Design a protein with these regions (language model features):
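Adenine nucleotide-associated cytosolic modules
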Residues: 1-204
Length: 204
């Protein structure tokens, strides 16, 4: 495959997304994450081990993916995604997969993909709940994240996992579904979640 996929966040969602996409033979994967690995991440960020603590997530993740698929083109961005740098970073990617953990970044990615008519596959996890959204902005009637979230959260930078906690396995469930949505969009097969919200309650 020659598709180019940018993963925003190498955390609980980004980890399984990156692993499955690398193994599937995606042409190029970019990962952006400015954070370092912490011991509290290890219950859900399965691409990392205890030997990676205090090291940059995006750089370590890229090294792990290279071992899975040495033919894969990889690019690491050790920085925070902002309105000033998003076009420079994302313009050469076909699909954006949002694994971020705050609304400010989610809205930034949503608005950029809407403007540039890119495909966006967004996921979110908190406590025992997870959601997946697919937006194909090349289609005229595709909704966007703001269509589903009518009221802007008071704290756009809130990190749900940090303050509320999250079931470790939930990241794997939602991240795998996001990776599956990427595959369906690239291959043009099956029914995607475009226009829908998939909600997972891990306690049911």
């Amino acid at each position: 495959l020659k598709s180019r996929v940018l993963i925003v966040g190498a955390g609980g969602l980004g980890s399984p997304i990156a692993i499955y996409l690398a193994a599937s033979g995606i042409g190029k994967i970019g990962i952006i994450d400015k954070d370092n690995v912490e011991i509290s991440n290890l219950n859900r960020q399965i691409i990392f081990t205890s030997s990676d603590i205090k090291k940059n997530k995006s750089s370590i993740a890229i090294n792990k993916l290279r071992k899975i698929n040495p033919d894969l083109k990889l690019q690491s961005f050790n920085k925070k995604l902002t309105a000033k740098n998003i076009n420079q970073i994302a313009k050469n990617f076909d699909l954006i997969v949002d694994g971020s953990d705050n609304f400010r970044t989610r809205f930034l990615i949503n608005d950029y993909c809407l403007e540039k008519k890119k495909i966006l596959i967004s996921g979110a996890i908190s406590k025992f709940d997870g959601q997946v959204y697919t937006f194909n902005f090349s289609k005229k009637k595709s909704p966007c994240l703001r269509c589903f979230i009518s009221h802007t959260p008071t704290n756009l930078d809130v990190d749900n996992c940090e303050y509320e906690g999250v079931l470790g396995t939930l990241g794997g469930i939602i991240g795998s579904i996001q990776a599956n949505e990427v595959a369906k969009e690239i291959l043009g097969i099956g029914d995607t979640l475009c226009g829908h919200i998939l909600v997972i309650d891990a306690l049911k």
